[in-house]
Amino acid sequence: MVNLRNAVHSFLVHLIGLLVWQCDISVSPVAAIVTDIFNTSDGGRFKFPDGVQNWPALSIVVIIIMTIGGNILVIMAVSMEKKLHNATNYFLMSLAIADMLVGLLVMPLSLLAILYDYVWPLPRYLCPVWISLDVLFSTASIMHLCAISLDRYVAIRNPIEHSRFNSRTKAIMKIAIVWAISIGVSVPIPVIGLRDERKVFVNNTTCVLNDPNFVLIGSFVAFFIPLTIMVITYCLTIYVLRRQALMLLHGHTEEPPGLSLDFLKCCKRNTAEEENSANPNQDQNARRRKKKERRPRGTMQAINNERKASKVLGIVFFVFLIMWCPFFITNILSVLCEKSCNQKLMEKLLNVFVWIGYVCSGINPLVYTLFNKIYRRAFSNYLRCNYKVEKKPPVRQIPRVAATALSGRELNVNIYRHTNEPVIEKASDNEPGIEMQVENLELPVNPSSVVSERISSV
């Protein structure tokens, strides 16, 4: 209690000094608290060099807050919005958890190291733990993006096979595998660091991974290999989407073998259609023209939706690539050219590039906000403290008919304006399938006009 009281007193004193004597301050409030609580043996309180202020550190605090807050919004959106309940968004929520933990556990300690001029101010046993968390969450980010890329490619390439194994439980299992791989990559660091402090300290003061073999192997396993898989699968996904769109535009479709369910198709029945049935040539031409006109409608919309989703994910992939590649490339070069390279320059570059990678954790929520209406609307509601889930209007269901009673025959379900009750009639034998005829009850139309909906009987 005495140490805590002294720490609070020290914080208030230095905060007043920061507000009143900004130009003369020599100790930051955060540094004062840490020094008073831990009473480290590294010596005294931190002092900025002459002429240097702590405003860059304050800007980093803003980045940390935005990273934590933005990823919390993503987690809330996926948890509360039913439209976002799918495998890809579950992966994005898990990715947001990793990014949020970067803002909570990794970035503040890195900021603390900057305040102390990269002299580790905390107990030394915490250094390998902090490095392990850094590697864990960074690896989890790239593994999540790699898993998303693979999952979407399989879903677009083999939709039927993917739908059989695509459920919430399966998505959670895949996410668990991603986290298991990330933990497996990061666990050796505390073991190595606690056995030999030289593996995690440079010049016995700076907390940084100092094992060349682990740096090389870890960089390839945790970054370059998943990055290669991610780029290849994303390019293949774009190729498949373009090929499917071109085939639809030219009137060709790829139908998987076996049974398939047709989408609900609506058309108006008129007397001209019955007249054309008497002429086989005209009837055949009409069917071809009708089939060609209505084929792309639902499928093209699905492909457009996939393109939009792929565009958003592509931006996320590109941002991650641009912001983390400099760090890992410099990290590899610092090991390969240990003697020929300027190590001081390499250390300065790594200190800058690692923060560029950290900023990537806070950019993803901005990407979702700019390019996805559902996320944008959800974020807007949450920021206004509106957490109500939209309820869909009740849907009136038509009584179901047992499949065994159909036997390939057609049933006409007519809902008339004056009764609002369905009347089921058996149709003729020469028109197989199921036909539901529902009169429009809302719009002022001719009572004789009936909308016909045909569903394939499988």
Swiss-Prot record:
GO terms for biological process: behavioral fear response; chemical synaptic transmission; feeding behavior; G protein-coupled receptor signaling pathway, coupled to cyclic nucleotide second messenger; locomotory behavior; phospholipase C-activating G protein-coupled receptor signaling pathway; phospholipase C-activating serotonin receptor signaling pathway; regulation of appetite. Residues 287-297 have a biased composition (Basic residues). Gene3D superfamilies: Rhodopsin 7-helix transmembrane proteins (1.20.1070.10). GO terms for cellular component: dendrite; plasma membrane; synapse. Pfam families: 7tm_1 (PF00001). A motif (PDZ-binding) lies at residues 456-458. A motif (NPxxY motif) lies at residues 364-368. Residues 274-301 are annotated as: Disordered. Ergotamine binds at T139, L209. Residues 81-86, 152-167, 237-311, 371-458 are cytoplasmic. Disulfide bonds join C127-C207, C337-C341. The chain crosses the membrane at residues 56-80, 87-111, 129-151, 168-189, 214-236, 312-336, 348-370. It is found in: Cell membrane. Coiled coil: none annotated. Keywords: Behavior, Cell membrane, Disulfide bond, G-protein coupled receptor, Membrane, Receptor, Signal, Transducer, Transmembrane, Transmembrane helix. It is a multi-pass membrane protein. Residues 1-32 form the signal peptide. G-protein coupled receptor for 5-hydroxytryptamine (serotonin). Also functions as a receptor for various drugs and psychoactive substances, including ergot alkaloid derivatives, 1-2,5,-dimethoxy-4-iodophenyl-2-aminopropane (DOI) and lysergic acid diethylamide (LSD). Ligand binding causes a conformation change that triggers signaling via guanine nucleotide-binding proteins (G proteins) and modulates the activity of downstream effectors. The PDZ domain-binding motif is involved in the interaction with MPDZ. This is 5-hydroxytryptamine receptor 2C. The gene is HTR2C.
